Amino acid sequence: MKCPFCSHPETQVVETRVAEDGDFVRRRRQCGACDKRFTTYERPEVSFPNVVKKDGRRIEYDRSKLIGSFSIALRKRPVSTTQIDSAIERIEEKLLNLGQREVLSSRIGELVMRELKKLDKVAYIRFASVYRNFEDIDEFRALVDEVRK
């Protein structure tokens, strides 16, 4: 692997560890030219289903969109990045287990809402109010009442 510091084409693996959950491998590498060390992560490459939008367009699955949705909903909420990553991984696992080539964006939205509801009720309400496109206060109030139960 090329060194990110000096671009030397060869580096040596000096340490390898499997993550606690076994999902990826962490490697410490050292450059033979500049002697600097850096870390790489290896995880299996998987093929997610394409996402079918409301208007019928088909786009590639994009993890960063999930991260963005969680970040907005959880802004200034007491939820760690580890918890967010775990929630996203659960969603991705469900998408892969569907075994389908396409998934509706609404299905992904429902999975996000389910995970947010477990993580933080306020974030769940924030996301749901935008996702479900509430048009009046009564819809909002009904959701809050549902969460309180």
UniProtKB/Swiss-Prot annotation:
Any one Gene Ontology molecular-function term assigned to this protein's record: DNA binding
Family matches, as PROSITE patterns: ATP_CONE
Zinc finger (unnamed): 3-34
UniProt signal peptide: none
Tree of life domain: Bacteria
Cofactors that this protein relies on: Zn(2+)
Domain ATP-cone residue range list: 49-139
GO biological process, alphabetically ordered: negative regulation of DNA-templated transcription
Keywords of the record: ATP-binding, DNA-binding, Metal-binding, Nucleotide-binding, Repressor, Transcription, Transcription regulation, Zinc, Zinc-finger
InterPro entries from the UniProt entry: ATP-cone_dom, NrdR-like_N, RNR_NrdR-like
Free-text cofactor note: Binds 1 zinc ion.
Free-text function comment from the UniProt entry: Negatively regulates transcription of bacterial ribonucleotide reductase nrd genes and operons by binding to NrdR-boxes.
Entry similarity comment: Belongs to the NrdR family.
Full protein name: Transcriptional repressor NrdR
Organism whose genome encodes this protein: Paracidovorax citrulli (strain AAC00-1)
